[in-house]
Amino acid sequence: MVYHDLIIIGGGASGLMAAIVAKDFGMDVAIIEGNDRIAKKILATGNGRCNITNDTISFPFDTFHSENSNFFLETLNSFTIEDTKSLFLSLGLPLMKLEDGRMYPRSLQSSSVIDIFRMALEDKQIPLYPNCKVTSVDKKKNFTLYTNNTDYEKFSCNKLILSCGGKAASKTGSDGSGYKLSRSLGHNIIEPLPGIVQLKLDYPYLKALSGIKFDGSVTILINDSVVRTERGEILFTDYGISGPAIMQLSYYASKALYNNSKVTIRVDMFPNESKEDLENFFTTHFSMFNYRDISSSLIGVINKKLIPIILKDAGIKDIHLPCGNIDWKYINRLLDKFKKWDFNCIGTNGFPNAQVTVGGVDTSEVNNITLESKLVKDLYFCGEILDVHGDCGGFNLQWAWSSGYIAGKSASN
């Protein structure tokens, strides 16, 4: 049996942070990692550049979400963006700010972040046990951990941090096994759901729309009530819809679909213009080219591949009819589609394609100041395993750094 004062299960972002902090506080700490190397999920973040944090994060932290909306406030206040920048600089990794406050390593390489952590573990002599999947945990006086590695079948520790992640991006090793360990120690799990993920639509012309992208705004409606609107690039696919604006809204869709609610995705192709603006423009436009068919008249105004589809949706069956011969009520329907093109959302693209997990360990059972379990003494949590997630844009990694720091510090006291 291998003994350490503190063992961290999971060598992802939050677990690595917790280990470094605990070691700096003088703890005998080790990391057990199920993969063959640390932080595989970091490689995929920020399109391979690693969006480490976001410079816009501030109280009341409305880009973070949990069933317990106050849980994360203390943690994010205690280890801030400035603390994150300082800590990475101390490890040898300067950061730079790009669009929308997103911060990256100056190298713009995710691999740099992993290399910096790997060197930090070596410098601080923090043992790492890779290819070691923890299958069960017992708690008596100390914690006893059992693994599937024949060389290291059994571990013991006085204090334990669970930083096993969630279920998102499952190809990186995130299989939800931390939930099983948490349940075995008495904790409840808020149903894990895919977040920051593409959405599936029920629409007959998806194959024709596939590959079309444009800048616009997207609104999600739950049971016909508006919940949130986002602007950005919108991409249609053969299964539904994607793009940054969609990814931001997907959290609401996941939860609503799980609760069997009606989910509508409303696309506004002209977010900078009002319906009246469009009426004025098209009145002039169609008058100038009243001899042209309606289909040709829309070329240059919207994506050419969209024209026959949106005309059908507006009830204009003959797309070769001259503009001057079309009843204005049909033109009005077309303008309505430009501003409010509604789609029925029937699902998400699942955990393999999700960037974050919605749900996790019930935070009502965790101390919001120390991140120690309220049920099991000397058990701590950090990162995505908890029922906390953020919007797309570096917010989830900031939660990893902040919660990892607090868990590592608290476990060292």
Language model segments and positions:
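Core beta-strand elements of the Rossmann-like FAD/NAD(P) dinucleotide-binding domain
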Residues: V2-H4, N149-K159, T229-R231
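Beta1/beta-strand and adjacent pyrophosphate-binding region of the FAD-binding site
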Residues: M1-S14, A30
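An anion/pyrophosphate-binding glycine-rich loop and adjacent beta-alpha core
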Residues: D36-I38, L43-A44, I52-F59, N188-E191, ...
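A glycine-rich dinucleotide-binding beta-alpha-beta segment and adjacent secondary-structure elements
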Residues: Y129-P130, P308-H389
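Glycine-rich FAD pyrophosphate-binding loop
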Residues: I7, K23-N47
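Short hydrophobic core segments
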Residues: I7-I9, I32, V134, K154-K171, ...
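Glycine-rich active-site loop/strand segments that organize a redox cofactor
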Residues: R49-K97
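A conserved short coil-to-beta-strand element within the FAD-binding core of flavoproteins
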Residues: P130-N142
